[in-house]
Amino acid sequence: MQIWVDADACPSVIKEVLFRAAERRQITVTLVANQSVRVPPSPFIKSIRVESGFDVADNEIVKRVSKGELVITADIPLADEVIAKGALALNPRGELYTAENVKARLNMRDFMETLRASGIQSGGPAPLSQADRQAFANQLDRWLARLPK
């Protein structure tokens, strides 16, 4: 059982939470990115560098993830794919994607993308807040608590 991280867009503060959890629970955290990612020396923290390209890191995560594992991503299409494989997906703001809610999130993402492309809506999400960080840590702790000791 391990945690996979879509590391290219994962905020540093969230990575730090994951690194502490990896050490505390002795669970493997693997960061997947198309650029070098600095990780602390630990037998529980790994990184995989993939080639640059559209969805290359996402495809690597989908290929490697197993049922019941956790994927950290803000990428809703990636969340949809890993959920289809029986994994769980958690975004850096603490929202747990499930089979019940991921399709609605995907539809909303596509709608917002259309609005941005037409010039009606601009900008992206607000910066990560302290409440977001706490919500992420709480969801991560809930997932970790379900693991066998």
UniProtKB/Swiss-Prot annotation:
Superkingdom in the source lineage: Bacteria
The protein's name in its UniProt record: UPF0178 protein Sama_3557
CDD domains per record: PIN_YqxD-like
Matches recorded under HAMAP family: UPF0178
InterPro entries linked to this entry: UPF0178 (IPR003791)
Homology family: Belongs to the UPF0178 family.
